[in-house]
């Protein structure tokens, strides 16, 4: 309906050009928006105010000129000029139902559009270090990323979903060392576990599995392991901190590698990696989050991509040596300072891997790269964009979307979390408690960059205050009505229903039709803004309209034309509810 109003206004502009009011080359942008107040009509435009300087007349006078030239329309009931020159359009109630045939014909594809025009997009999200189970913070990134990818697919983009596996670097070495130390304890060795090691129960499980496979084959005396290792950090009774936990764990990593040797160290490393990554894959699949590609950081090293990217930067004069390290001139591209890419000891930094990874993404030919990161990585954005620019690529091709971590509340009390200490609520535990549907919806019902308090009690409640329950109940209510009609011997005749839409004269019916017509526009707008919360908000609004209609109207009436018209309307509502919920990977139950 909105595009029809825009087309009418475009015809007025053409007439202005023919009359010489506007220059033939002038191309004004025609803005048509939904009104917030029904007393102001259904749609409004500020076209008169946009043209006032060009036409040389006050905006209200320009508005009168526009209204006088509006062609006849079979959808517009009346037009009013308001305020300084807004033009409000009132749509005939019967015309509001014109969207219903499109919904019934398109079915699950209703709402899809082509604003993406087939452009290829790589959406990389979650990408949690495989050092432990996914926690509830990762869950928000997973739900948001999956919903953004689905939105883009519905909007005409060619979408690839990718998980970047950080299977190299210090954190993975800490994981391997932690696993081996727990394995030694299984072997009967007595030792003090490092304060900076991974302490979760999952480490015990992996170590036990390793022991069951290898027996004592990887056992070394604990005194050999800790010989020459820097003291761990401890706090004395009077509050003094002694030792160095970072040096302690780094020394233990080195001793682990030396004592095990390359082959056996790789056995421990791969055992921990495979166990945790396998759990992550399973966890995400159960959460309705799938990826086409799991991209290994280690593959960047093995294939020489990191060296190739750094060589390209070096050839462009963007890398220099200082104090034995190699630095990238990121400050030339807006970063606050230059960044190390190769340390004094010859080891490449995480940033070097990230440069190579984004270089690889561009080499694969994607038009748009979307990185979805935790908000704690906000300072990392300028340096990555700087690297892309230095590699002679368009930094605007990269969109970095930040996600605030979720904070859980149960019984009004905040739940504390720490991954390293093993004190956290896993995504699996959250799903077990509130269900995947509630988790997926709650995670995306606010802007990703907004702080999120996740109320576990609310997510489990069967009340109208729980938004996902409220929306699913609207869908179930429609299914219940249709089932009841069948039980009474009334078969739905949508052809008759569509032919009698003029019998739908109640305000809730027109309101529902207006909401249904908005869905394709919401999809396009939400996709371009990367904002799935717009879909969540829309579904709540549509569910509210359905519940209001249900509470005020009898659907199964004796008069067949009216009955079929009303049932056809709610079938259309059911379809759009299904489409929106499916986009967010939330079920649409038929019974509740």
From Swiss-Prot:
It is found in: Cytoplasm. The keyword ATP-binding applies. It is an enzyme of class 6 (ligase). Keywords: Aminoacyl-tRNA synthetase, ATP-binding, Cytoplasm, Ligase, Nucleotide-binding, Protein biosynthesis. One of its GO terms (cellular component) is cytoplasm. It holds the Pfam family Arg_tRNA_synt_N. CDD domains: Anticodon_Ia_Arg, ArgRS_core. One of its GO terms (biological process) is arginyl-tRNA aminoacylation. SMART domains: Arg_tRNA_synt_N, DALR_1. Its EC number is 6.1.1.19. GO terms for molecular function: arginine-tRNA ligase activity; ATP binding. InterPro entries: aa-tRNA-synth_I_CS (IPR001412), Arg-tRNA-ligase (IPR001278), Arg-tRNA-synth_N (IPR005148), Arg-tRNA-synth_N_sf (IPR036695), ArgRS_core (IPR035684), DALR_anticod-bd (IPR008909), Rossmann-like_a/b/a_fold (IPR014729), tRNAsynth_Ia_anticodon-bd (IPR009080). It comes from the Bacteria. It catalyses: tRNA(Arg) + L-arginine + ATP = L-arginyl-tRNA(Arg) + AMP + diphosphate. A motif ('HIGH' region) lies at residues 128-138. Belongs to the class-I aminoacyl-tRNA synthetase family. Monomer. This is Arginine--tRNA ligase. It comes from Hydrogenovibrio crunogenus (strain DSM 25203 / XCL-2). The lineage of its organism: Bacteria, Pseudomonadati, Pseudomonadota, Gammaproteobacteria, Thiotrichales. The gene is argS.
């Amino acid at each position: 309906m909105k595009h029809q109003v825009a087309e009418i206004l475009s015809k007025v502009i053409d007439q202005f050009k023919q009359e010489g009011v506007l220059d033939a080359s002038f191309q004004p942008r025609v803005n048509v928006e939904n009104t917030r107040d029904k007393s102001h009509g259904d749609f409004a435009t500020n076209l008169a105010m946009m043209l006032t300087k060009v036409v040389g007349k006050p905006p209200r006078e320009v508005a009168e000129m526009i209204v006088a030239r509006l062609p006849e329309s079979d959808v517009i009931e009346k037009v009013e000029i308001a305020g300084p020159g807004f033009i409000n359009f009132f749509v005939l109630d019967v015309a509001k139902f014109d969207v219903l045939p499109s919904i019934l014909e398109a079915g699950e594809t209703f709402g899809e559009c082509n604003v993406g025009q087939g452009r290829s997009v790589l959406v990389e999200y979650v990408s949690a270090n495989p050092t432990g189970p996914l926690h509830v913070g990762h869950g928000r990134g997973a739900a948001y990323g999956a919903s953004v990818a689905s939105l883009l697919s519905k909007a005409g983009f060619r979408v690839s979903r990718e998980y970047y596996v950080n299977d190299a670097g210090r954190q993975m070495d800490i994981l391997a060392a932690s696993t081996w130390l727990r394995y030694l304890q299984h072997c009967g060795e007595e030792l003090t576990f490092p304060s900076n090691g991974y302490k979760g129960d999952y480490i015990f499980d992996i170590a036990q599995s390793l022991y069951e496979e290898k027996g004592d084959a990887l056992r070394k005396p604990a005194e050999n392991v800790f010989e020459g290792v820097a003291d761990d950090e401890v706090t004395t009774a009077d509050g003094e901190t002694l030792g160095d936990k970072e040096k302690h764990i780094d020394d233990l990593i080195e001793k682990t590698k030396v004592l095990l040797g390359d082959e056996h160290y790789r056995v421990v490393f791969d055992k921990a990696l495979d166990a945790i990554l396998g759990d992550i894959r399973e966890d995400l699949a159960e959460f309705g989050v799938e990826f086409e590609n799991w991209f290994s950081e280690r593959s960047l090293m093995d294939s020489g991509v990191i060296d190739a990217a750094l060589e390209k930067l070096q050839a462009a004069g963007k890398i220099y040596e200082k104090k034995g390290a190699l630095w990238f001139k990121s400050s030339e591209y807006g970063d606050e300072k230059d960044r190390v890419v190769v340390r004094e000891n010859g080891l490449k930094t995480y940033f070097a891997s990230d440069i190579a990874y984004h270089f690889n993404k561009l080499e694969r030919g994607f038009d748009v790269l979307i990185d979805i990161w935790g908000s704690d990585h906000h300072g990392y954005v300028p340096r990555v964009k700087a690297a892309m620019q230095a590699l002679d690529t368009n930094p605007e091709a990269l969109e970095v979307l930040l996600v605030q971590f979720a904070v859980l509340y149960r019984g009004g009390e905040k739940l504390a979390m720490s991954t390293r200490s093993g004190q956290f609520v896993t995504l699996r535990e959250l799903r077990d408690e509130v269900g995947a549907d509630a988790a997926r919806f709650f995670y995306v019902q606010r802007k990703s960059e907004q702080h999120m308090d996740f109320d576990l009690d609310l997510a489990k409640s069967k009340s109208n205050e729980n938004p996902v329950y409220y929306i699913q109940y609207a869908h179930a209510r429609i299914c219940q009505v249709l089932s009841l009609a069948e039980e009474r011997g009334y078969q739905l005749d949508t052809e008759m229903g569509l032919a009698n839409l003029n019998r739908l004269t109640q305000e809730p019916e027109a309101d529902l039709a207006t909401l249904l017509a908005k869905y394709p526009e919401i999809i396009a707008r939400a996709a371009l803004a990367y904002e799935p919360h717009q879909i969540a908000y829309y579904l709540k609004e549509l569910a509210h309209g359905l519940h209001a209609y249900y509470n005020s109207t009898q659907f199964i009436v004796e008069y067949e034309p009216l009955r079929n018209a009303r049932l056809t309307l709610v079938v259309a509502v059911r379809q759009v509810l299904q489409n929106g919920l499916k986009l967010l990977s939330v079920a649409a139950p038929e019974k509740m």
